[in-house]
Design a protein with these regions (language model features):
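Short coil-to-helix segment of the ABC ATPase nucleotide-binding domain corresponding to the Q-loop/switch region
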Residues: 97-104
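Helix-to-loop junction immediately C-terminal to a conserved catalytic motif
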Residues: 52
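Conserved ABC ATPase "signature" region
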Residues: 67-68, 104, 108, 115-132
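Conserved signature/switch motifs of ABC ATPase nucleotide-binding domains
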Residues: 136-139, 157, 164
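Conserved ABC transporter NBD signature motif
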Residues: 60-68
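ABC ATPase NBD coupling module
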Residues: 69-85, 109, 228-232
């Protein structure tokens, strides 16, 4: 569906040449929800905007449905863009037009008839839950409702690809949840491919099947979302995952804790097994759970626990070895 081949983008400033995207190569499969995550300045938005050529690469290819979009003439590019919907962080609605006219706008630009528009727009507004808002203006809507208008507008020309540029970063938690659920529903119902960027791992975790992690213009990690969370490989990925899982203990608590503190990661079936209770029955140690959580990512369980272990040194060593053998990882983080 989308194939980035050695894509690079540079910007020349008075002081230096900025390498916004560096030699990026990966594919997005048809019908999937694919995420790109990274901190500010990682190159996420710049890369996303190459798909509809709002940013033109200095090098490499961007193939959409087998066509290198960077080589299209103006007319062919206009036609290609009609099938690529885009939603933005700050909605980009026309504030002097009603919700109905905002959704109808791309249809008018593409030459659709008044009959086609009058049939399609109400269907789209019903799809996004805004049938009763057709004749109000954007200024009268909440942030979540504005983004729903943006989604309806992005689908107006029967897009087969939806680009989502930080679609929830300006929303509260409840609106974020509802917008992500709407995107997921549209993806499943119509088979639309979704390429979504975010700086929030929680957004990626809740909706994407695969994710590319970007840092300083490069893709430093790429995997299915469950593997990214349960087995992050790059240090940037590890930092993002740690921040998302938020399994931390204040330094003051660490300083007052005797014995070893072990971070235990459970993956798959091990997250549901009574490993800790088996361990303390097997070895005569005292164990206290300091922090922990179990999550379901892509319908697969993953658990993280921080446990404090006290006892005879040999028993503690043997118990930690037992944990390492029966969980994904067990790491002493404080001794």
């Amino acid at each position: 569906m989308i194939k980035f081949e050695d894509v690079s983008i540079t910007f020349n400033t008075e002081k230096a040449t900025v390498h916004a995207v560096r030699n990026v190569s990966f594919e997005v499969n048809k019908g999937e929800i694919f995420g790109i995550v990274g901190t500010s300045g990682a190159g996420k938005s710049t890369l996303l905007r190459t798909v509809n050529l709002l940013e033109k690469p200095n090098g490499g290819k961007v193939n959409v449905d087998g066509v290198d979009i960077t080589l299209l003439d103006k007319q062919s590019l206009r036609e290609a863009r009609q099938k690529i919907g885009m939603i933005f962080q700050h909605y980009n609605l026309i504030h002097t037009k009603t919700v109905y006219k905002n959704v109808a706008f791309p249809m008018r630009i593409s030459g659709k008839s008044a009959k086609e528009i009058s049939k399609k727009v109400p269907e789209l507004l019903e799809e996004v839950g805004l049938s009763d808002k057709a004749h109000v203006y954007p200024g009268q809507l909440s942030g979540g409702q504005k983004q729903r208008v943006g989604i309806a507008r992005a689908l107006a020309n029967d897009s087969h690809l939806l680009l989502c540029d930080e679609p929830t970063s300006a929303l509260d938690l409840e609106s974020t949840k509802s917008i992500l659920e709407l995107i997921r529903t549209i993806n499943k119902k119509y088979g639309i491919t979704v390429l979504l960027i975010s700086h929030e791992m929680d957004v990626i975790k809740s909706i994407c099947s695969r994710v590319a992690v970007m840092s300083e213009g490069e893709v430093v990690d790429l995997n299915d979302v469950y593997s990214i969370f349960s087995n992050p490989r790059h240090e940037i990925t590890k930092q993002l995952v740690r921040h998302s899982l938020n399994v931390e203990i204040p330094d003051g608590i660490l300083g007052d804790t005797e014995g070893k503190i072990v971070k235990v990661l459970y993956r798959g079936s091990s997250a549901l097994n009574p490993i800790l209770s088996n361990a303390i029955r097997k070895y005569p140690v005292d164990m206290n759970i300091l922090h922990g959580r179990i999550e379901y990512i892509d319908n697969q369980p993953m658990g993280v626990l921080l446990v404090n272990i006290n006892g005879e040194n040999n028993d503690v060593v043997n118990l930690i070895h037992y944990l390492k053998e029966n969980t994904a990882t067990a790491e002493v983080i404080h001794d």
